[in-house]
Amino acid sequence: MSELAGNGCQIIVPFEERKPLKEIERSILKKYRKYTWSKFIKAIKDYKLVEEGDKIAVAISGGKDSLLMAKLFQELKKHGQVNFDVEFIAMDPGYHPQIKELLIENCEHLNIPVHIYESKIFEIIDEKAKEYPCYLCARMRRGHLYNKAK
């Protein structure tokens, strides 16, 4: 187990062989078209989530869900009919250096130009909410991301 940082956070970091970027991008449009790409496009259209000239921030935690969302938006920008800008942001709330490095490596491998900024949230949480850090940590991270996206 690797410590994420702070006193209450631990995660298991899987270290697996990465697939080639071209294979990953092709699988989004081909292999996972029905289960992922089509549903993503349907939601974008049904809820008018992307309109001409929009600037969209995709927050990346480093997990598979946010990395997939980033790739979906890249593919939409590349193949879509609407002109929009997309920016990929990631917050470093005080990650263990290995965790931050893994985030950077994964984004580089996936050709996701992520902008990482520091927030020191884990330090604040360790001082203010040692016994039950998760609720306050989640609220603070969300607030920081909303402000950064503006």
Positions of predicted regions on the chain:
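ATP-dependent adenylation/nucleotidyltransferase module used to activate substrates
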Residues: 3-150
